[in-house]
Amino acid sequence: MSKQLCEKMSKIYLLITHIWAVTNLETLEAIKGVTRSNYGAPLLLVVGCRPAEAWVRRYDGKNGAEVDAAIVATYLMLAAENEGLATLWVGSFDPALLRDILPCTEGYDLVAMINVGYPAPESTPSAMHSERKAVEELVTRVV
C-alpha cells in the first residue's frame, strides 16, 4: 500500500476505525470457531469502529461508523490484491466470540474479518462471486 494512501486513510477514516492484524497461529486457530469462513490464511485483519466517535448525518441521525470501516476494509483488500495477495471479506462471524478471543477489540463494533494470503492454485470462487444480475436490474437511470 502506498505511503500516500496510508496517510490519506489515516486522516479520513482511521479516526474511528481500528484494524487488528492477527498472525499468531494459536490465535488464528482459536478464531476458526468464530466463523465457517476459514481458509488457512496466515494473516487475518479484523476491522472495527467506534460509532460514538463517528460522523452522524444531521437529517436523520444515520451514523457513518460502519460505512467508514467498510471503506477502510475495502482499501485494505484492494492494496493487498495489488501486491498479488488474495483476500476474503468475512461478514458472517460471531462478534461476541471473537471479542472473547481478542479482548483488545472491546469498545469497538466489529465490522469485518479479512483473510489475507496467497491463493491456492486450485481455488475457485463460489458461484455467488461470478453470477450477476443484469445491469438494468441494478441501475435506474433518472432523466
Predicted ranges, named:
Residues 36-45, 103-125:
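A glycine-rich helix N-cap at a beta->alpha junction
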Residues 87-91:
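Short beta-strand segments at enzyme active-site cores
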